[in-house]
Amino acid sequence: MVFYFQSILPYIPASLLTNKDSAMKHFLYSALAIFLLAGCSQKPQSDVDTPEYHFKAGMRAVESGEYNAALTSFQRSVDLDKKFAPGYCGLGLAHAHLGNVKEAKKNVDKGVSKGSKDPDVLALGARVWITLREHEKKWFKRASKLLDKALKRKENHEASLYYYGVAYLYNYDFDEAESYFRKVVGKKGTYAGKADAKWNLAQKIVRAMPGTPVGKKVALHEKITRADLAVLFAEELKISELFARMPQQNAGFQTPGQASAGGSAVNPVDSKGHWAETWINEMTKYSVLDVSPDRKFYPDEVISRAEYAMAVQRLLVVATKDPGLEIRYFGESPSRFSDVPSSHYAYNAMALCAERGIMHADMITGNFSPSGPVTGADALLIIRGIQSSLRMTF
């Protein structure tokens, strides 16, 4: 305290220091004391009121998606210790998830500056930049710089290897991501479980072979929307090219669900102005994806496995010119799925996809999970299954 007081003496006017007015002196010293105390760390109020404890609580909140609660915990950690580097990186991470880009960058820079020799802090800093990938063009460069530094501090540092894999995954270098996740799984440490899940995802995407930039982006989605599927069908399956190669349908051909292969000339009322408008209109034109009776497409709704199966069925019916495909499996006894009766509206589509190896039931339970979501990677694998079924190469 004395040191800090002495350090600011040169900036105090001499007239104030020599002032004989005791009231003025008292006011001056009181103000200085308050100022100095405000810059100091707060005192803990219990044995568990420590920076480390609050940091761990903050990280648990982050993993649970409770980012405002995380901010509170991380802030307390640095209030208790102004030099606590992990706390600042934690603040950066929570702000990044909340979209507070300026605060996220400020805190992560402060954290890695204070913890430049700690590989755990550097890895956490890299995680912040990965989270900011939608807001910062140089996110990969910044993240990899911190991870390289961490790995120099500690060779084969587990967290750094894991987040290098995550960085490559979101940079769409899936082969490189696989390599890092494989290393982490082999270490059988704290990150092994997470790495195994990401490794499986990377392997699945590699098998799906997304051939377009949009395919690579959607491949990472945990749930895809109807708009996402429209884009995938247009770009990865190349529906327009597929239909152009097909011979014209017979004049009287109709599927039970669609009037013709040409579909409706009227675009959905909710596609106009949507980011996927062009692709949505293309898919509804060919009746591959349906429009509801109120003429809406509902592009931002998450698509279910049953809905995806129905879309695949429509495509196969038109491609094969066999309307019987839409009713072939209805009423089967017993049902081939343990969770879906053969009277289900989408049962035929699900059975058709399973029969042709395009979509699969769970190998253990036999469940098809019709209301479950479709991941981006699974959506791409299904498209490859469609191509295989149609024996087409693009």
For the regions a protein language model found, what residue spans apply to each?
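Short, Lys/Arg-enriched N-terminal segments with co-localized hydrophobic residues
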Residues: F3-A23
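Alpha-helical segment of the N-proximal tetratricopeptide repeat
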Residues: S46-K83, H97, E134-H135
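N-terminal propeptides
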Residues: K43-D47, A85, V101-K106, S113-S116, ...
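Sec-dependent signal peptide recognition
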Residues: K25-S30
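C-terminal motif of bacterial Sec signal peptides marking the signal peptidase cleavage site
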Residues: L37-G39
